[in-house]
Amino acid sequence: MPTGTHRPTRRFPLVWVFAAVTALLMIAVAGYAFLSSPAAVPVFADGTSSAAPVAASPAPVQTSKSAKPTPKPSKSPKKVSFWGDTSTIPAAKNVLTVKILNRTNGKYPDSKVYWSFNGQTHSIAEQPYFDMPANSAGRMYFYLGSPTGQYKDFIEFTVGPDVFNGNTTRVDGFGLKLALRLHAHDGYDTQVGEDQATFAEDRSATFQRFQNEVPTEFKHLATVQAPYYIPAPGSDSAFRTGGQYANYFTSYAQANGVNEPTSNIFGCAGSMAGNPNMCAALNRHVAGQSQQSDPSQYYKAAPANYYAKFWHDHAINHLAYGFPYDDVAGQSSFISHGDPQYLLVAVGW
């Protein structure tokens, strides 16, 4: 073709164009009808189809920027019995097994709680048990901090071939909170000593409570040797001859036919050593009364041994050795039983 010329444009008849457009529209409509028909989804023999169900969109969760997940409640720690697990106490080869318990409420570790008996001294960490032989008698001492420390106290006992006799004592004074639990092979089980409420409180709280609960004449006992000791009134200079309270019991004692100094009445010494009933009656202020064996009548009026009363008030079953003849009418912390299995000694702060 010569340069500069144009190829003529081929024109289709208008009727052809119209026919083609019409055909395309018909195909589109037919396809839409097919896809919209249930027949378009294959149905299987069990009645199910291949079409996946359309799940409804979940409702949007309302959140807050300040909202925090609720923490799961923590489990309460398992409460440990005051006396601990007794099932692990080894059987005695001698008369009974003694186990010493640290009940200082975390004040001292086991390595700083000591016991001493018959030439042996150990911390609880070293040796928590002692196999008590027969014919043992005397005192077992307990110390906090060091085996020669000033925080100390003791229990008293005698052990026969098949029997235990013993007690805690406040006759001389208070040094440490102590409690005993004696268990025998026949099922006998008893406890004496300071109650658990007293063990639970701090030492300073016990000293303060003593001052709060006793009359004026006795308050100074909690300060004269603090923080180590609360002496019994019979050994305190204020109640001895020449002391501020030397005549505390004088008039009351004389009215009941007793001519002994106040310190001898507290300590059941002199003529009182041979007259336990009278000594107990004077200390409890029930001398001359008909109900001298009724504990509900004790310490109702002054003069009385309010030092002893305090330890009774805060002892297990209100039993304590507050003065030498506190065993009159069964009010002491003395325990005794045959065929003993073990003795637990709780040492507190």
What do these predicted regions represent?
Residues P2-H6, P13-Q62, A67-W349:
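Extracellular low-complexity, O-glycosylation-prone Ser/Thr/Pro/Gly-rich "stalks"
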